[in-house]
């Protein structure tokens, strides 16, 4: 095949041969590999046949460059493989037909000439002709194995005579033999055995069935070109009564001839295919036969191997063989990395040949025409060291560890074993193991044994520091299934933290192994083309284990007892949740996500879990010395605690402490608030408490992080070199309250909580999904749910928008997440909790004429900026060099567009994405009150919007800068239009303020006992409302970010009391979580937010367990504004969250630039 490139795409073309009846049958054409390309070039290369299936014509050939290889290989496929749906039959090294790189020796020159004939004389090396233009011998060599067996005894006798002649042969003759480039190797016949056949049946099959499975590469290698002709190593087998050893001969310097250490293989038979006289391999074949006879008849012979000069063979310790008595064994060559070779038909062992092992390959320099190239990396070759002696040992047939003597040096030994492990994993990844009778169990067991040996080497004190990168071999083991069937009443179970492994929560190593330098090396290596198959395999196994764990999951009717020491009885749904929590702490990973609707008593449920496990530990009196066994060897914890670390927003730390004091008997649980400037930082003291409560901000402050750790699994994060007591303690349990605070995996808080060490991990949140599926990934990373805590695998296997990804997400949520809503019914048809009625009231408002005029000015300017941005965005495409699918930018900017470039100057107007979103924010403020336009955007409020503006952008973000003029004026100019100054005064009643006051007055007239909660995302809006409430004589209190936690709890208690204030003003971000405002039954949402879950959280401040009155939720929407469009976007986000939490696995909808078009009517 020639090197033909497509003139349009520049890629190598495929060579296509017509095989159907018609005018093009037997003709060949070069065609571009791109589906849409029409490039075709005819050629006169004749038809050739497949090396695997010699009766079938090769219909497709292509030059491909395997990953991590420097030379192209010629891949081919015949019509048989095409009919079977296979990608390729195999590949051979490719060299340009015009190349002049031939061997120096005469015989090698002849071989080179036969291999590198011009394309118009012979098409590729599939049908190699000898120097007399006659068909090659390989077809004759593989047939008639029965005749070979008959002549076996005669050949051995002849071999003795030849051996004597060989001993007398002169050095010059030996040198001539060496010049041919052949390295004699033992040969084997192969046969497929059934697992149940033993004894006489095996012997019988050995006599009759070994012909059809001969390894074709063994034959092919006899006729290769170059000065280093190699053949795949095979092994010979003695009868059970004989003891055989491998032999290596040490020759003199002028006639160095090296034979490979050939371990005995299981059931291999010593049959030799003898070539015809006069064949080009006759002399070398005779020498090989003589050496084999010597190996049989001689006693224990010392096997030595001299170090070879460059250009000679070096041993490739990739695979191994195992001695056992019996008949012939089936053997196969592993497929080329990344390519499915006949679906691995001959690449992997199965139960049909259970007692055999992989082929030991003799690797040659690149370019040797082995059908499958399996050469070592140059660096690996240089590091290999081999012993001078070879000792045969008998091991179990399924052993995955080579039983040849490995290098005594730990460095070389690990390289030696790692090389074997890589090949076996490559074989496993390239094979459809589901098609094998034993599902690939034998190969998996071999990989596990190799990993165990390598794990032992990693822990060895002899290991040098320079070996760290090589020692990090992925660990894989069988899953363990929990078989304990849940009783109708679940007893408390102790934390199973003894003897378990936190790294790889599903007993699988994370898909990403992280080196000390911070770089990641993905599972089974990014460097192989089979990485996709490897990722698919580990993902499927992890999902399968989670799915199987559901078999032991407690049903809806299963409840747990109230723990001793709890003052208040648990409600039915809380008892059911406690049963589920206890079950999850016995699974992998230990812990999960409690995502009950807000107001269902998640705090009390978690307190009950802590109390239950404490009571159980006291009963069993477990020794503290064994508590660290669940930690990874990399974890550096100084103290072990049986306590729980609770991390929550600052506003809730006193709430947690008060709940424990009110709900639990005194002296049952010791609680400590790790907060404030005078906190106790002694790790030994903190480890003695049952509960330690701290805040997200304090954790982020004390635990150092860097941005590169955002995509690294939590188990691999570096925790060294820090003195914070939180990291020095191995906790029994960590609880993240309001866990949506870590929804962005890139922020410091999220990375910091993932570094903490604990046996069980819990994420408690009523809204686990707020924006997109990345929120869910962040929680899984905290839970250390491998392999899904590795970001690249999460994106490729789950968050990929495919149906399969949705199914995987469904399994994850069903296994790890418990979600109940207030309106959910139990098995008897009754609601989970008895709550009063809740009614939503939507108030449609019409802006006043002045307000509408101001709004239209802003809208026109913002719409023009968006149109300009969309034009530039569409023309530029993705030429910015960033991935448009970067999830972190999707979180920051909920429309999936680009991050702001802070280095750019603020244009007038600058049509950046952030600027457009800030203009949208101003439009929403127009709908509330025009006085909001006077102030610059508050950085805290911008953070809630997901916006980050520079100082210059904040000052120029459409504020009424004209108001700063020194000359007093009764009008103000906005974008060329003049408005009255009084429109922007805080005391002026806007449309929404007027409607709000009317509703409040109506509530007071109907019932003086009813109270109201008013929510806004802007603190300035709350100040405006407060002015008007005071003007109308209504008492109020305000909770925003400026109120400290202690004052906040006092204000809540006062509001819930009958004599407290009539109205509570809360900001959406500061007061939207953790507050119990059941004293009020009316809630007013003054403005619209992109994130509907934030509004739902605010609504649940009053609609929760403990509410005695009917609840009314008021929403204000101005007609003809963006608020109407925001309602549509909120529904999209709610649908996304509903699909994920229900585990429906439906396709997810992400917000895009199309939503911006909808908002502005473009």
UniProtKB/Swiss-Prot annotation:
Instruction: Answer yes or no on keyword Transferase.
Output: no
Return the Low complexity bias intervals: 233-245, 323-338
Q: What does this protein do?
A: DsDNA-dependent ATPase which acts as a transcription termination factor by coupling ATP hydrolysis with removal of RNA polymerase II from the DNA template. May contribute to mitotic transcription repression. May also be involved in pre-mRNA splicing.
Q: Where is the Helicase ATP-binding domain?
A: 583-786
Q: Which segments carry the region annotation Disordered?
A: 97-116, 142-358, 388-407, 459-503, 871-890
Q: Motif DEAH box — list its residue ranges.
A: 737-740
Composition-biased stretches (Basic and acidic residues):
142-178, 246-258
From the Swiss-Prot or TrEMBL record, give the protein name.
Answer: Transcription termination factor 2
* Subunit composition and interactions: Interacts with CDC5L. Part of the spliceosome.
- EC number annotated for this UniProt entry: 3.6.4.-
In this UniProt entry, the residues modified to Phosphoserine are 460, 883, 908
* GRF-type zinc-finger residues: 6-46
* Superkingdom in the source lineage: Eukaryota
Record's CDD domains? Answer: DEXHc_TTF2 (cd18072), SF2_C_SNF (cd18793)
What family does the database annotate? Belongs to the SNF2/RAD54 helicase family.
Q: Name one GO biological process term.
A: termination of RNA polymerase II transcription
For binding ATP, which residues are annotated in this chain's numbering? 596-603
Alphabetically list the UniProt keywords.
ATP-binding, Cytoplasm, DNA-binding, Helicase, Hydrolase, Isopeptide bond, Metal-binding, mRNA processing, mRNA splicing, Nucleotide-binding, Nucleus, Phosphoprotein, Spliceosome, Transcription, Transcription regulation, Transcription termination, Ubl conjugation, Zinc, Zinc-finger
Taxonomy, top ranks, is: Eukaryota, Metazoa, Chordata, Craniata, Vertebrata
- Subcellular localization: Cytoplasm; Nucleus
Where is the Helicase C-terminal domain positioned along the sequence?
Answer: 995-1157
The GO terms this record gives for MF are: ATP binding; ATP-dependent activity, acting on DNA; DNA binding; helicase activity; hydrolase activity; zinc ion binding
Q: Where is the composition biased (Polar residues)?
A: 105-116, 219-232, 261-274, 459-485, 877-888
Does the keyword Zinc feature in the UniProt annotation? yes
């Amino acid at each position: 095949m020639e090197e033909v490139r497509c003139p349009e795409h520049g890629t190598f073309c495929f060579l296509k041969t017509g095989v159907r009846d018609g005018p093009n049958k037997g003709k060949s054409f070069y065609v571009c590999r791109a589906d849409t390309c029409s490039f075709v070039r005819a050629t006169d290369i004749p038809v050739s046949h497949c090396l695997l299936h010699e009766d079938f014509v090769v219909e497709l050939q292509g030059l491909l460059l395997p990953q991590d290889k420097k030379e192209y290989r010629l891949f081919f496929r015949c019509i048989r493989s095409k009919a079977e749906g296979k990608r390729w039959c195999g590949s051979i090294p490719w060299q340009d037909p015009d190349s002049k790189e031939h061997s120096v020796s005469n015989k090698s020159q002849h071989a080179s000439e036969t291999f590198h004939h011009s394309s118009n004389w012979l098409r590729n090396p599939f049908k190699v002709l000898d120097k007399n233009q006659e068909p090659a011998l390989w077809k004759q060599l593989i047939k008639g194995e029965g005749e070979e067996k008959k002549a076996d005894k005669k050949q051995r006798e002849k071999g003795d005579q030849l051996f004597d002649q060989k001993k007398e042969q002169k050095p010059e003759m030996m040198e001539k033999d060496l010049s041919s480039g052949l390295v004699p190797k033992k040969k084997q016949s192969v046969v497929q055995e059934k697992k149940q056949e033993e004894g006489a049946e095996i012997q019988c099959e050995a006599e009759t069935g070994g012909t059809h499975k001969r390894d074709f590469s063994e034959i092919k290698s006899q006729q290769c070109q170059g000065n280093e002709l190699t053949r795949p190593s095979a092994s010979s087998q003695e009868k059970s009564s004989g003891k055989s050893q491998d032999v290596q001969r040490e020759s003199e310097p002028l006639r160095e001839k090296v034979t490979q250490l050939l371990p005995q293989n299981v059931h291999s038979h010593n049959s030799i295919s003898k070539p015809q006289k006069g064949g080009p391999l006759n002399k070398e074949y005779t020498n090989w036969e003589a050496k084999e006879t010597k190996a049989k008849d001689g006693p224990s012979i010392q096997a030595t191997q001299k170090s070879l000069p460059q250009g000679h063979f070096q041993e490739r310790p990739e695979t191994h063989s195992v001695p056992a008595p019996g008949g012939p064994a089936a053997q196969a060559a592993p497929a080329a990395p990344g390519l499915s070779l006949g679906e691995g038909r001959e690449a992997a062992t199965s139960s049909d040949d259970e007692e055999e092992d992989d082929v030991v390959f003799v690797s040659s320099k690149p370019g040797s025409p082995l059908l499958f190239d399996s050469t070592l990396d140059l660096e690996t070759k240089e590091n290999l060291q081999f012993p001078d002696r070879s000792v045969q040992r008998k091991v179990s047939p399924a052993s995955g560890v080579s039983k040849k003597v490995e290098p005594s040096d730990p460095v070389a030994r690990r390289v030696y074993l790692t090389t074997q492990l890589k090949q076996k994993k490559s074989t496993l990844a390239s094979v459809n193991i589901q098609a094998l009778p034993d599902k690939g169990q034998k190969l998996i067991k071999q990989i596990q044994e190799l990993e165990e040996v390598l794990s032992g080497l990693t822990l060895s004190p002899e290991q040098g520091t320079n070996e760290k990168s090589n020692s990090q071999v992925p660990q894989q083991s069988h899953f363990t299934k929990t078989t304990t069937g849940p009783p109708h009443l679940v007893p408390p179970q102790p934390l199973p933290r003894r003897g378990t492994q936190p790294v790889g929560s599903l007993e699988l190593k994370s898909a990403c192994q992280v080196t000390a330098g911070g770089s990641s090396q993905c599972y089974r290596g990014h460097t192989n083309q089979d990485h996709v198959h490897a990722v698919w395999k580990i993902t499927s196994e992890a999902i399968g284990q989670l799915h199987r764990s559901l078999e032991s999951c407690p049903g809806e009717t299963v409840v747990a007892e109230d723990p001793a020491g709890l003052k208040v009885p648990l409600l039915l749904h809380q008892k059911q949740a406690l049963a589920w929590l206890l079950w999850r702490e016995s699974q992998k990973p230990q812990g999960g996500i409690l995502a009950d609707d807000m107001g269902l008593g998640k705090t009390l449920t978690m307190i009950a879990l802590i109390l239950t496990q404490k009571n159980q530990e006291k009963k069993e009196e477990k020794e503290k010395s064994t508590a660290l066994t669940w930690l990874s060897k990399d974890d550096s914890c100084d103290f072990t605690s049986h306590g729980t670390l609770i991390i929550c927003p600052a506003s809730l730390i006193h709430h947690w402490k008060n709940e424990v004091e009110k709900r639990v008997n005194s002296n049952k649980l010791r609680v400590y608030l790790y907060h404030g400037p005078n906190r106790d930082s002694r790790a030994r003291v903190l480890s003695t408490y049952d509960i330690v409560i701290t805040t997200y901000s304090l954790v982020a402050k004390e635990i150092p992080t860097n941005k590169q750790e955002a995509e690294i699994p939590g188990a691999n994060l570096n925790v060294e070199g820090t003195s914070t007591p939180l990291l020095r303690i191995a906790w029994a349990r960590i609880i993240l309250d309001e866990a949506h605070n870590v929804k962005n995996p890139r922020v410091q808080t999220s990375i910091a909580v993932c570094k903490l060490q604990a046996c069980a991990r819990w994420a408690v949140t009523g809204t686990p999904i707020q924006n997109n599926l990345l929120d869910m990934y962040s929680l899984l990373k905290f839970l250390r749910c491998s392999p899904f805590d590795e970001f690249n695998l999460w994106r490729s296997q789950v968050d990929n928008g495919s149906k399969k990804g949705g199914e995987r997400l469904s399994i994850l949520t069903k296994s790890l997440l418990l979600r109940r809503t207030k309106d959910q019914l139990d098995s008897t048809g009754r609601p989970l909790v008895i709550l009063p009625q809740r009614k939503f009231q939507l108030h449609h408002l019409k802006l006043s004429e002045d307000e509408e005029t101001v709004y239209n000015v802003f809208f026109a300017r913002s719409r023009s900026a968006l149109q300009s941005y969309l034009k530039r965005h569409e023309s530029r495409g993705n030429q910015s060099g960033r991935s448009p699918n970067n999830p972190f930018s999707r979180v920051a900017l909920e429309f999936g567009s680009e991050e702001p470039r802070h280095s750019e100057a603020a244009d007038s107007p600058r049509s950046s994405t952030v600027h457009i979103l800030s203009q949208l924010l101003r439009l929403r403020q127009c709908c509330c009150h025009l006085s909001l336009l006077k102030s610059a955007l508050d950085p805290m409020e911008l953070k809630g919007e997901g916006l980050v503006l520079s100082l210059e952008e904040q000052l120029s973000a459409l504020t009424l800068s004209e108001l700063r003029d020194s000359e007093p004026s009764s009008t103000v100019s906005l974008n060329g239009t003049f408005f009255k100054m009084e429109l922007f005064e805080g005391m002026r009643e806007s449309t929404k303020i007027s409607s709000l006051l009317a509703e409040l007055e109506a509530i007071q007239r109907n019932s003086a006992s009813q109270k109201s909660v008013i929510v806004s995302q802007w603190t300035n809006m709350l100040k405006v409302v407060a002015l008007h409430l005071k003007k109308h004589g209504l008492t109020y209190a305000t909770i925003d970010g400026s109120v400290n936690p202690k004052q906040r709890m006092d204000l809540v208690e006062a509001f819930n009391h009958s004599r407290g204030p009539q109205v509570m003003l809360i900001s959406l971000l500061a007061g939207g979580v953790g507050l119990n405002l059941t004293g009020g039954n009316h809630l007013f949402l003054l403005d619209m937010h992109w994130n509907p879950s934030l509004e739902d959280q605010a609504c649940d401040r009053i609609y929760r367990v403990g509410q005695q009155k009917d609840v009314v939720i008021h929403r204000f929407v101005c007609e003809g504004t963006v608020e109407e469009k925001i309602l549509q976007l909120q529904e999209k986000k709610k649908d996304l969250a509903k699909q994920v939490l229900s585990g429906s696995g439906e396709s997810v909808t992400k917000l895009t630039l199309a939503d911006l078009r909808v908002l502005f009517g473009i």
